[in-house]
Amino acid sequence: IDMQDTNKYKVYKAITAVGKWLLFAIVSFLILFPVLWIFVSSITPPGELFKMPIDYIPDHPTLESYKFLIENVGLLEKIGNTVLIVGVTIVVSTVICAMAAYGFSRFRTKGISIAFAFIIATMLIPEVVTARPLYDFMRAVGLYDTYPGLIILYISAVIPFTVLILKNFASEIPISLEEAATIDGANFVQRLFKVVLPLMKPAIATVCIINFITCLNNFFTPLYYSNNIQVLSVAIVQLPLRDNMYGVPWDLVSAMGWIILLPIIIFVAVFEKQIMDGIMAGGVKA
């Protein structure tokens, strides 16, 4: 009987392992196939895109789509705009939110708790709800279609999540470390910059990475609040048609989509551990 039970357990374990790997393979295929197909479409000549039967590997791969984007769509300018706006957003939002997170984690009064709750609650408000009032406000104060205006909107979009993660992480830092620094003669600023912030580096790195991805994927803000300042996320809907070509230029759409996806894929692949560790550490305590 013991031998039979052992054999049954081995069979069950083998079936479970096969099932897990099969499920993993199916999910991976469903996720990766569209990404790979975008890349294949981007290097496929327009005349071969809709050829039947479908060629999953193009007969005549070409980089003409990327060349066309660089020469005719101002791709380098869009990349520059994206780097400027996203870079300033990450730096400014991280500094502001790190200061705010420290205050929320250390000064526990009713008013501060209410302010924190209001900030987090804004994560639940859809962008379309505030679109028209913000649009009118941006035009009234002269910030519509300007770099400062877009940067302010980008910063406001990432503040709630950043404050939440950093505040929860800061709450886990023992106050005794600051008390020891105070005994050694450190003032408030020294405690903040020499004790607390260095310990928050994992969480700060995490929110910087996630905010980079969030800003890079932000489609609504640059589309609605800007006309002349173009970034990568909206470039895909502003692609011109080639000469004597009607309909959607799918090869250009695929090339632009791949250009947008590539830095995100690289960032997630390189910083996967930091992202997960930071989120887990920042989500321990609300």
Predicted regions and their residues:
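Short, Lys/Arg-enriched N-terminal segments with co-localized hydrophobic residues
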Residues: 1-2
